[in-house]
Amino acid sequence: MKTFQLGFVGMALLAAACGANGADSSSSTGSDEAITDDHVGTALRVTQTNLVSDQPGVAVTTDPNAVNVWGISFNPAGPAWVSNNGTGTTEVITPVGADVLTVTVPVPTYVQADAGVSSTPTGQVFNGSATDFGGDKFIFVTEDGTISGWQPSTGAVLHDDYSSIGAVFKGVGLGPSMIYVADFHNDVIDVFDSTYKQISVAGGFEHPALPKGYAPFNVFVNGTQVFVAYAKQDKEKHDDAKGYGNGYVDLFDTAGNFEARLVSRGVLDSPWGMAIAPASFGKLAGALLVGNTGNGFIHAFTLSEGGYGGTTATYAGYLADTKGKELFIDNLWGLAVSPAPDQNRLYFSAGPESESHGLYGRLDVPGDFDAGQ
């Protein structure tokens, strides 16, 4: 029987965790108004296990490829695939941190093969179809504006190159025989069919006006729900401008029709990682977890459907360390729940020290993980 260490945090603790501005979650209405600290939620204590890092002594495995570790995806019958933005690679990592395969993600076509330049992978997805995307099992997008696919017989192959228009692909989600790609520079969700051809969808991922300078940062698909996280662009429109309240999360259907603004500003700070909390997460089980790249915190929102307003999100709490303090992971990127039989594991990736290093690890409710697995 799994045990849970759950605690309720007071207003003062939540205010301290949110910083001097006292920013908290938005209400379920998705209002752009400043949020006060009147949403007291559950602090779920988790244990952090660092599995892979490029820095000796930081994790179970030291791997020089693990620099600015970013996207995470799972083959339901196998271990995690984890992208390293800083070295242009993707690695297959077991639950105990062993690296069993390294894949080089292709560079854009304009880069010479001998130029000594690596690609910049960000998000990735697993494709379970035997025919869609030419049978590619894993699909990678990059800040170079490229899309590549991998399968055992060919390795990683470049399929789309939008570097010439300055595309900066920060994230990707898999829909019904299509992928949704967040082009942060051009402020658009690009959609590609199962042949890697760019297409239009009915809704076009049009959304109610955001403040100037916000753009799609990542896409997370859960069944028929498509969640899009928005971050504030820097002056070059290449990277995010971090800061408390800098972020939004919207909900769309698979045809790109806007359904709801779930979270506005509040506790968000360049949100990127998104996942549905596993059953082992007690009172937060089933909640939408949103990880902030800006401040390294992970917040939870309970989703409710029905009624005139459609789907709404209510602030539910956050992840805390074993001492009850809000869990901090420097330059947090990915969040992903592993498939059966280990579906109660939440994995994370990060690029600590301004993306100069990397970290991949696991977050467990105490007593939930057998290290011998």
Describe the residue ranges of each PLM region:
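C-terminal motif of bacterial Sec signal peptides marking the signal peptidase cleavage site
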Residues: 14-17
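Bacterial N-terminal signal peptides that target proteins for export
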Residues: 1-8
